[in-house]
């Protein structure tokens, strides 16, 4: 049996895996255990009551968290003309068309989010094999293919998170940093859960938000009592 690290021993002693914690208690526990030499991210896993094998029950979308994610997001925009100027004014880090596509083909991808106007998809479409595996391919379902590129840039910069269930029907995303206040993490989590409720597939039956767990980058998951959250859409 593998030897437990000191940190893992402490986590095992502190975290009751059979318990659902009130949100403020859960955050306090995470912050106590976030002892890495860097500021750890706070991540969430939401088990959904869906059959992920059925395409009509898959959940995908994006929402802006009220307090952002604590990360500085670099945004690349494929567009031209007046939209290019609007994107730059909105804070886009890189704006272009064929020239930007050439950078991507060379592996020069110093950005976290890609936005495209519909007329640019003829260029972006050629980059699917590069952007797709990295989760960077623009998609109208998450608002990154849009005629209003300026709004998409502002949303990305403001801390928009994209979500998509995995094959087990679980959503994984980041909702902040370990140095956020408990209230900031709570409000970010509530905003995400409200967005997920709105995205519930009509064919999904029974309890939709089955389990909510939060963790830090290097820590264990802590189950959250949903009764301690305000998720009224």
Curated annotation (Swiss-Prot):
It comes from the Bacteria. Keywords: Repressor, Ribonucleoprotein, Ribosomal protein, RNA-binding, rRNA-binding, Translation regulation, tRNA-binding. GO terms for biological process: regulation of translation; translation. GO terms for molecular function: rRNA binding; structural constituent of ribosome; tRNA binding. One of its GO terms (cellular component) is cytosolic large ribosomal subunit. The keyword tRNA-binding applies. The keyword Secreted does not apply. Belongs to the universal ribosomal protein uL1 family. PANTHER family: 54S RIBOSOMAL PROTEIN L1, MITOCHONDRIAL, LARGE RIBOSOMAL SUBUNIT PROTEIN UL1M. Part of the 50S ribosomal subunit. Binds directly to 23S rRNA. The L1 stalk is quite mobile in the ribosome, and is involved in E site tRNA release. This is Large ribosomal subunit protein uL1. It comes from Vibrio campbellii (strain ATCC BAA-1116).
């Amino acid at each position: 049996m593998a030897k437990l690290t000191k940190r893992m021993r402490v986590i095992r002693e502190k975290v009751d895996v059979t318990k659902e914690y009130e949100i403020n208690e859960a955050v306090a526990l995470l912050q106590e255990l976030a002892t890495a030499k860097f500021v750890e991210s706070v991540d969430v896993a939401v088990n959904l009551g869906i059959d992920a094998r059925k395409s009509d029950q898959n959940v995908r979308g994006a929402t802006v968290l009220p307090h952002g994610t604590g990360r500085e997001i670099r945004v690349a925009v494929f567009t031209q003309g007046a939209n290019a100027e609007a994107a730059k004014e909105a804070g886009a880090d890189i704006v272009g068309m064929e020239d930007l596509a050439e950078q991507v083909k060379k592996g020069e991808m110093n950005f976290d989010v890609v936005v495209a106007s519909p007329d640019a998809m003829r260029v972006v479409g050629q980059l699917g094999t590069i952007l797709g595996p990295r989760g960077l391919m623009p998609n109208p379902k998450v608002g990154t293919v849009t005629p209003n590129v300026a709004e998409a840039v502002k949303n990305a910069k403001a801390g928009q998170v994209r979500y998509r269930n995995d094959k087990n029907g679980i959503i994984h995303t980041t909702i902040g940093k370990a140095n956020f206040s408990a209230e900031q993490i709570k409000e970010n989590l509530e905003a995400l859960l409200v967005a997920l409720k709105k995205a519930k597939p009509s064919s999904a039956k029974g309890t939709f938000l089955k389990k909510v767990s939060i963790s830090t980058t290097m820590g264990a998951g802590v189950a959250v009592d949903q009764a301690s959250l305000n998720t009224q859409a």
